[in-house]
């Protein structure tokens, strides 16, 4: 009985023993598997690794973008400065010429006063004190208006005898006076006005045009 049991144990041990050749095969398979995994990982690492020269190209591109950004900032700053300057000029013009429409209305009053002073017969002013006082009162009123408007930059000009200038003169008729130069202002109907060198109203004039004999 005991001998039978021993034989069975020996038989079991013999059947479960791992042969050396099988162990070596398993170890080789494990080595090959690890090697294959490492080799498989190499292509991925190569793909993630930057190509030669790509870093320099990226730096150069960033420099170009930085320069472009600087230019845009300079352009923006220049535009803002221009807007600020134009706004300042517009404000100054508004202050200087804001009364232009108002002065045009006052010109009619001054024209009437000027016309009134010219209606007084000069030869009788010294003979008639009341007439002379009235003339002086009208003249003083005219001068007061001119002074007030002058304080605001409005100036009157009389172009008699000057060369005709279509920028400042408006011809309403022609003269033929051989004693005066051709194409000059021979008569002034209404004097002209400027506001800070800007023409408010041209002078209404008669131009001398000498006709050939």
Curated annotation (Swiss-Prot):
<keyword id="KW-0143">Chaperone</keyword>
<comment type="function">
    <text>Essential component of the PAM complex, a complex required for the translocation of transit peptide-containing proteins from the inner membrane into the mitochondrial matrix in an ATP-dependent manner. Seems to control the nucleotide-dependent binding of mitochondrial HSP70 to substrate proteins.</text>
</comment>
<protein>
    <recommendedName>
        <fullName>GrpE protein homolog, mitochondrial</fullName>
    </recommendedName>
</protein>
<dbReference type="InterPro" id="IPR000740">
    <property type="entry name" value="GrpE"/>
</dbReference>
<dbReference type="InterPro" id="IPR013805">
    <property type="entry name" value="GrpE_coiled_coil"/>
</dbReference>
<dbReference type="InterPro" id="IPR009012">
    <property type="entry name" value="GrpE_head"/>
</dbReference>
<keyword id="KW-0496">Mitochondrion</keyword>
<dbReference type="Pfam" id="PF01025">
    <property type="entry name" value="GrpE"/>
</dbReference>
<dbReference type="GO" id="GO:0005759">
    <property type="term" value="C:mitochondrial matrix"/>
</dbReference>
<feature type="transit peptide" description="Mitochondrion">
    <location>
        <begin position="1"/>
        <end position="32"/>
    </location>
</feature>
<keyword id="KW-0809">Transit peptide</keyword>
<dbReference type="GO" id="GO:0051087">
    <property type="term" value="F:protein-folding chaperone binding"/>
</dbReference>
<dbReference type="GO" id="GO:0006457">
    <property type="term" value="P:protein folding"/>
</dbReference>
<feature type="region of interest" description="Disordered">
    <location>
        <begin position="34"/>
        <end position="54"/>
    </location>
</feature>
<comment type="similarity">
    <text>Belongs to the GrpE family.</text>
</comment>
<dbReference type="GO" id="GO:0000774">
    <property type="term" value="F:adenyl-nucleotide exchange factor activity"/>
</dbReference>
<dbReference type="GO" id="GO:0042803">
    <property type="term" value="F:protein homodimerization activity"/>
</dbReference>
<dbReference type="GO" id="GO:0005739">
    <property type="term" value="C:mitochondrion"/>
</dbReference>
<dbReference type="GO" id="GO:0030150">
    <property type="term" value="P:protein import into mitochondrial matrix"/>
</dbReference>
<comment type="subunit">
    <text>Probable component of the PAM complex at least composed of a mitochondrial HSP70 protein, grepE, tim16 and tim14.</text>
</comment>
<dbReference type="GO" id="GO:0001405">
    <property type="term" value="C:PAM complex, Tim23 associated import motor"/>
</dbReference>
<dbReference type="GO" id="GO:0051082">
    <property type="term" value="F:unfolded protein binding"/>
</dbReference>
């Amino acid at each position: 009985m005991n001998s039978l049991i021993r034989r069975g144990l020996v038989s079991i041990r013999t059947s479960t023993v791992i042969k050396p050749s099988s162990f070596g095969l398993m170890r080789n398979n494990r080595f090959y598997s690890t090697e294959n995994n490492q080799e498989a990982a190499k292509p991925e690492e190569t793909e993630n690794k930057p190509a030669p020269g790509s870093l320099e190209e990226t730096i150069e591109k960033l420099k170009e973008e930085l320069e472009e950004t600087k230019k845009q900032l300079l352009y923006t700053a220049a535009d803002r400065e221009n807007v600020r300057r134009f706004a300042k000029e517009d404000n100054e013009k508004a202050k200087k010429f804001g009364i232009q429409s108002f002065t045009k209305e006052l010109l009619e009053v001054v024209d009437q006063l000027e016309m009134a002073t010219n209606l007084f017969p000069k030869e009788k002013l010294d003979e008639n004190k009341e007439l002379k006082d009235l003339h002086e009162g009208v003249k003083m009123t005219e001068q007061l208006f001119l002074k007030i408007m002058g304080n605001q930059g409005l100036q009157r000009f009389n172009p008699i005898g000057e060369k005709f200038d279509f920028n400042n003169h408006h011809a309403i008729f022609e003269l033929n006076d051989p004693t005066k130069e051709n194409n000059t202002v021979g008569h002034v109907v209404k004097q002209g006005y400027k506001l800070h060198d800007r023409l408010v109203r041209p002078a209404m004039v008669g131009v001398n045009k000498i006709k050939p004999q």
